[in-house]
C-alpha cells in the first residue's frame, strides 16, 4: 500500500513539474512575440523625433517653390506683415487674371532663426502645402506670436523726482509725570528676646523608670530643697536660703512630688528648668544646672536630654549659650 502511494505521489509531482515548465515556455514566447511586434513602431517614432531640423527646412522649401504659379507662398513667420502690406510679385502673370496678394519672395528673404521656425512634423507640412495649392488665395490661419517674435519692451521711465509725503502734524506728547518712589515700608524686625527658659531632662534608659527613693536621695545630695508648687528648687545657698536659681519637676503631670510617698513612687524622668535672666551670673547658673543633671543621671542610671528630648551634644550646648547671650544683650 505504501509503495503504491509513493508511486502515485512521484507521478503527480512529475506531471506538476512538466506543467510548470510548459507554462513558463509558453509565457516567455508570448512576451517575446509582443516585444518584436511593438519594436518597429517605436523605432519609426524615434527616428521621426530625431530627424534634423535641416530636413524640415528642405521640405518646406520644396512646397513653397512652384513653377506653375508665379507667386510664392507666404512665410509662416510674417503673416501679419503680409496681411497689412501686400506687395505685387516682380514677375508678370501669364494670364489676364488679377495678381493675388503675396509677400516678398522667400528666395530673397533671410530664413528665420531656429527659435522662430514652426515645430511641425513632416506629415503636417505636406498636408498644409496641398491645401495651399487648392486654395491659393485663402490666407492661412493666424498664428499666435511667440515671445521671441515680440519686440523688446522698453522699461517705463521712472519719474525724475519723488513726491514727498505731506507733512502730518505729530500729536503733542505730554511728558509723563515722574512719580516719586514711595519709601518702602520698614521691614518688621522680630521682637527682641527679653527672656527665655532653658530646659534639661533626665530619663531612664530604654523606656525604664526611676525609683522614688533613689531619686529623692540624689536630688537632696545635688542641693535641691522641696518647696513651693510641690517641686524641688536649687537656691543660691545649698541650705535652701536665697533666690532660686533653677528648679526640678516630675515629667508626668501634674509634675509635683510627695516626699512622704517617695518609697512607692516611680517616674520615667524628671525635668530641670531655669528662667533667664535670673539672679546672679546666668552662664554660671546654667553651668551649675548642667552639672546637677549629669550627677542625678549618673546616680539613677539615666541619661541627660535637651529640650527636644534628644541626646545632649556639643552643638546643642552652643545653642543654649547663644540664647543666653542674646537675652542678656537685649536686657543690658
Curated annotation (Swiss-Prot):
This is Cell division protein ZipA. Belongs to the ZipA family. Residues 1-6 are periplasmic. One of its GO terms (cellular component) is cell division site. Keywords: Cell cycle, Cell division, Cell inner membrane, Cell membrane, Membrane, Transmembrane, Transmembrane helix. Signal peptide: none annotated. Residues 98-107, 155-171 have a biased composition (Low complexity). Interacts with FtsZ via their C-terminal domains. The chain crosses the membrane at residues 7-27. It comes from Serratia proteamaculans (strain 568). The lineage of its organism: Bacteria, Pseudomonadati, Pseudomonadota, Gammaproteobacteria, Enterobacterales. PANTHER family: CELL DIVISION PROTEIN ZIPA. Essential cell division protein that stabilizes the FtsZ protofilaments by cross-linking them and that serves as a cytoplasmic membrane anchor for the Z ring. Also required for the recruitment to the septal ring of downstream cell division proteins. It comes from the Bacteria. GO terms for biological process: division septum assembly; FtsZ-dependent cytokinesis. Residues 34-184 are annotated as: Disordered. The keyword NADP does not apply. It is a single-pass type I membrane protein. The keyword Cell cycle applies. Residues 34-51, 61-72 have a biased composition (Basic and acidic residues). It is found in: Cell inner membrane. Residues 28-332 are cytoplasmic. InterPro entries: Cell_div_ZipA, ZipA_FtsZ-bd_C, ZipA_FtsZ-bd_C_sf. Residues 121-136 have a biased composition (Acidic residues).
Amino acid at each position: 500500500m505504501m509503495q503504491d502511494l509513493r508511486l502515485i505521489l512521484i507521478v503527480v509531482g512529475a506531471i506538476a513539474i512538466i506543467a510548470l515548465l510548459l507554462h513558463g515556455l509558453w509565457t516567455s514566447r508570448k512576451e517575446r512575440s509582443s516585444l518584436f511586434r511593438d519594436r518597429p513602431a517605436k523605432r519609426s517614432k524615434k527616428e521621426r523625433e530625431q530627424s534634423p531640423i535641416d530636413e524640415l527646412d528642405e521640405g518646406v522649401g520644396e512646397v513653397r517653390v512652384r513653377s506653375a504659379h508665379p507667386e510664392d507662398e507666404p512665410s509662416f513667420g510674417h503673416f501679419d506683415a503680409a496681411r497689412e502690406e501686400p506687395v505685387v510679385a516682380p514677375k508678370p502673370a501669364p494670364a489676364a487674371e488679377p495678381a493675388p496678394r503675396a509677400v516678398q519672395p522667400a528666395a530673397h528673404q533671410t530664413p528665420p532663426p531656429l527659435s522662430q521656425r514652426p515645430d511641425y512634423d513632416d506629415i503636417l507640412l505636406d498636408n498644409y502645402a496641398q491645401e495651399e495649392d487648392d486654395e491659393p488665395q485663402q490666407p492661412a490661419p493666424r498664428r499666435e506670436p511667440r515671445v521671441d517674435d515680440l519686440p523688446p519692451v522698453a522699461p517705463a521711465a521712472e519719474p525724475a523726482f519723488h513726491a514727498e509725503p505731506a507733512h502730518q502734524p505729530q500729536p503733542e506728547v505730554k511728558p509723563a509725570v515722574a512719580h516719586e518712589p514711595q519709601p518702602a515700608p520698614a521691614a518688621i524686625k522680630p521682637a527682641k528676646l527679653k527672656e527665655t527658659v532653658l530646659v534639661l531632662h533626665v530619663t531612664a534608659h530604654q523606656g525604664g523608670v526611676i525609683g522614688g527613693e533613689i531619686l529623692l536621695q540624689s536630688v537632696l545630695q545635688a542641693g535641691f530643697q522641696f518647696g513651693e508648687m510641690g517641686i524641688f528648687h536649687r537656691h543660691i545657698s545649698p541650705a535652701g536660703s536665697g533666690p532660686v536659681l533653677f528648679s526640678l519637676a516630675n515629667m508626668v503631670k501634674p509634675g509635683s512630688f510627695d516626699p512622704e510617698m517617695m518609697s512607692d513612687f516611680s517616674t520615667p524622668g524628671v525635668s530641670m528648668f531655669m528662667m533667664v535672666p535670673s539672679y546672679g551670673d546666668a552662664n554660671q547658673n546654667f553651668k551649675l544646672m548642667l552639672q546637677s543633671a549629669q550627677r542625678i543621671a549618673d546616680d539613677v542610671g539615666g541619661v541627660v536630654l535637651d529640650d527636644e528630648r534628644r541626646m545632649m551634644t556639643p552643638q546643642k550646648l552652643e545653642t543654649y549659650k547663644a540664647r543666653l547671650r542674646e537675652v542678656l544683650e537685649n536686657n543690658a
